[in-house]
Structure formats: C-alpha cells, structure tokens
C-alpha cells in the first residue's frame, strides 16, 4: 500500500486534477491512500486564528475540517475514489484508490498534538505508519531540490516541523517530490 500526500497548494496551483489523473494512471494496480492538505480552506483557518486569537486546539480541529473539505473536493473530481473517514475504513476498503477524510476523534485518541507544527504532512506520515504502508510519497507544488535531506526540507518550510520525527522510525520509503515529477 502506498500513501500519497497531495499538498494543499496544488489546488491553488490548479494542478490538483492533473496529479489525480497521474495517480490513476501510474498506480492502476496498487492500493493507494490519498491524503490531502487543507489548501485554501486551511489558509482561512490561519487567517481566522490571527483575527480572532482562538487557541491551537480550535485551529487544529478547524484545519482537520479543511482537510475533510479537500477530501470531498477530490471525491467530487474523481467519483470512483472511495472516501474513508477512519483507519479501519481504509483497512477494510476493497477500493483501489481511497481518499482519507480524517476523523478528529480518531486523531485525538491517537494523541496527535494540536499545533501548527503538525500539518497534513505529518498526519500523512502518521497514517502511513498505522497502515504499515510501503511508501509515503509527498507531492508539493514547491520546487524540490532532491539533494536536500528531510530535515533541510523542514527547515525551508517545504514539509512541516514535526515530519522528520513522524517518519524517524518508519520502515516505509519516504519521497518528497514536485508535482511535475509525478
């Protein structure tokens, strides 16, 4: 099984549909779980938090709702994908392409901290670990220098601050690529 994290900025870069088409073509005979970033919806959470000054716990829950909205968007664009709201639903699915719509309670029960240091990047790593995935492929709109380590990508803000810790003891392969390399 492969977990593919689609950066939220792919939506605003207008390449989301292209990436979904490429995933369908390239992984036709493999089980794939798509994790979406929150995109423009998550940006609105950041703006609202700055304006209203609510705590990170509230922002975290709202950012997860943003990921759910993006998952619904993917389902709207690709009606054949299955929308799964839990790890168990993913594990039981017979579908070939699944898009994860994260459940707030499931993540809270797993002890995922409510902080902007943990974004959909780290949540994709958490999911890949829980599912015992073979690979975590993180697709970004940013230009990726493939000579940089994960720590260097985190320093540059390409992946979130907690990502390296989330994949530190993982047995799956981790790749971070630009959308053009898909």
Where are these regions (language model features)?
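Nucleotide/pyrophosphate-binding catalytic subdomain
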Residues: 1-181
């Amino acid at each position: 099984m492969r977990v593919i994290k689609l950066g939220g900025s792919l939506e605003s870069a207008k390449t989301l549909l292209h990436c979904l088409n490429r995933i369908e073509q390239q992984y036709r005979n493999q089980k794939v779980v798509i994790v979406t970033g929150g995109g423009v919806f998550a940006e609105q959470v950041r703006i609202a938090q700055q304006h209203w000054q609510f705590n990170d716990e509230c922002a975290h829950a709202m950012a997860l709702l943003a990921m759910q909205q993006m998952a619904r968007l993917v389902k709207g664009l690709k009606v054949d994908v299955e929308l799964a709201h839990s790890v168990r639903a993913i594990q039981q699915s017979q579908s070939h392409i699944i898009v994860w719509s994260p459940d707030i309670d499931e993540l809270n029960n797993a002890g995922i901290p409510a902080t902007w240091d943990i974004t959909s990047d780290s949540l994709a790593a958490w999911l890949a670990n829980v599912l015992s995935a073979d690979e975590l492929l993180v697709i970004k709109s940013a230009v990726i220098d493939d000579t940089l380590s994960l720590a260097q990508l985190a320093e540059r803000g390409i992946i979130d601050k907690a990502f390296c810790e989330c994949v530190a003891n993982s047995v799956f392969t981790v790749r971070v690529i630009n959308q053009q390399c898909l």
